[in-house]
Swiss-Prot record:
This is Elongation factor Ts. It is found in: Cytoplasm. Keywords: Cytoplasm, Elongation factor, Protein biosynthesis. PANTHER family: ELONGATION FACTOR TS (PTHR11741), ELONGATION FACTOR TS, MITOCHONDRIAL (PTHR11741:SF0).
């Protein structure tokens, strides 16, 4: 005679996402001890998650609040809009903030519902049956403007930006966050661009100009012009503003009395 009920099987399936026969076997093996059955299935689930480790997690969402931005990945957009998945992302943001975590390692070790964030993510992964991954985390301590962008109305945000700033104009800071979301700058200012990258851009510009047959006496001016083009594409403060293309982002921020001190941009599935 079975020492468990159909309700136990149903509850175990709902909690772990395991199949009916797996749940029955787990309850039989543990003589109806529900907690041990859950543990056994979670161990099995964890192994299954490991087998799924090479799958791509190109879907998911970004979530942000109180100076914390996270990217939580899934394999499909179906899971990305799952209520439990969205709730987990928001809980992770709160856990990271509470723990004062500064990097992914710290975020995964942060406490959440009596476990670590990493354990909770893995448990939901086992339940849903897809690889889930907390991919990256960014945090700022100062005043922060946040912008989240949805690719479509039925999906959670896929692009998230935090802009840390000083000054009183939240509107100007949010405009900068929208700029970062739209034009994807890699650096805040020219000083942040690594010297080797500047040297490479300068060399490429010079070699290209020579290959185009430009006169030697004009090379320096041409190279500087092309290097400025690189800065306009990649440096936030040098970019033409999406709000007023006749002005740079820096010019608009200066007018508003705002100084951007840092930013982070996450886009689901992108580097």
């Amino acid at each position: 005679m079975a020492n468990y009920s159909a309700a136990d099987v149903k509850r175990l399936r709902e909690l772990t996402g395991a199949g009916m026969m797996d749940c029955k076997k787990a309850l039989e093996a543990t003589e109806g001890d529900f907690d041990k059955a859950v543990e056994n299935l979670r161990i099995k689930g964890a192994k299954d998650v490991g087998k799924r480790a090479e799958r791509a997690t190109a879907e998911g969402l970004v979530a942000a609040d109180n100076g914390v931005l996270v990217e939580l990945n899934s394999e499909t957009d179906f899971v990305a809009k799952n209520d439990e998945f969205i709730e987990l992302a928001n809980k992770v943001v709160a856990a990271v903030k509470a723990a004062g975590a500064r990097d992914l390692e710290g975020a995964l070790a942060a406490s959440l519902d009596g476990k670590t964030v990493g354990e909770v993510v893995q448990e939901l992964s086992a339940k849903i049956g897809e690889k889930l991954e907390l991919r990256r985390v960014a945090t700022f301590d100062g005043k922060v403007a946040t912008y989240l962008h949805r690719r479509s109305a039925d999906l959670p945000p896929a692009v998230g930006v935090l802009v840390e700033y000083t000054g009183d104009s939240e509107e100007a800071a949010r405009g900068a966050a929208m700029q970062v979301a739209a034009l994807k700058p890699k650096y805040l200012n020219r000083d942040e661009v690594p010297a080797d990258i500047v040297a490479d851009e300068r060399r490429i510009a010079e070699e290209t100009a020579r290959a185009e047959g430009k006169p030697e006496k004009a090379l320096e001016k041409i190279v500087e012009g092309r290097l400025n083009g690189f800065y306009k594409d990649n440096v936030l403060l040098d970019q033409p503003s999406v709000q007023d293309s006749k002005k740079t982002v820096k010019a608009l921020l200066d007018e508003a009395g705002v100084t951007v001190t840092g930013f982070a941009r996450f886009e689901v599935g992108q580097a």
